[in-house]
A protein has these predicted regions:
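N-terminal Rossmann-like or analogous alpha/beta NTP/dinucleotide-binding catalytic cores
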Residues: 1-119
Length: 120
């Protein structure tokens, strides 16, 4: 079995040192073990998502010398927003996964595996 490592920043603001540390550790693990490194954008929190922060995170990670095998990449060094996707295991933006989540939910529901949470 091959190891897959991923980093999933939230585009709610600029990357900070904690984000960069996590990205670096995930990247180092992937490169050390000769495995796949995936960049996935965790853009599910719509109200907190800041315009162009995903593109800026990609630019910042690239500037730091980190690369990834799958995920969104910036096609132009001077035009944030000119993104393409590399890899075939996407979608690499969480907001594009609704169909997958709906199918999984319906399968659990049909199988009788859903239950109410009784947490406080």
């Amino acid at each position: 079995m091959n190891l897959v490592s991923r980093y999933a920043p939230s585009p709610s603001g600029p990357l900070h040192l904690g984000n960069l540390r996590t990205a670096l550790f995930a990247w180092l693990q992937a490169r050390w073990s000769h495995s796949i490194f995936i960049l996935r954008i965790d853009d599910l929190d719509g109200p907190r998502t800041v315009h162009r922060m995903a593109e800026q995170a990609i630019e910042d990670l690239t500037w730091l010398g980190l690369d990834w095998d799958q995920g969104p990449v910036n096609n132009s060094s001077n035009n944030l927003g000119d993104l393409s996707i590399k890899g075939s295991c996407g979608p690499y933006f969480q907001s594009k996964c609704d169909d997958h989540y709906t199918k999984a939910f319906n399968k659990l529901k049909e199988s009788g595996y859903l239950y109410k949470c009784v947490c406080s």
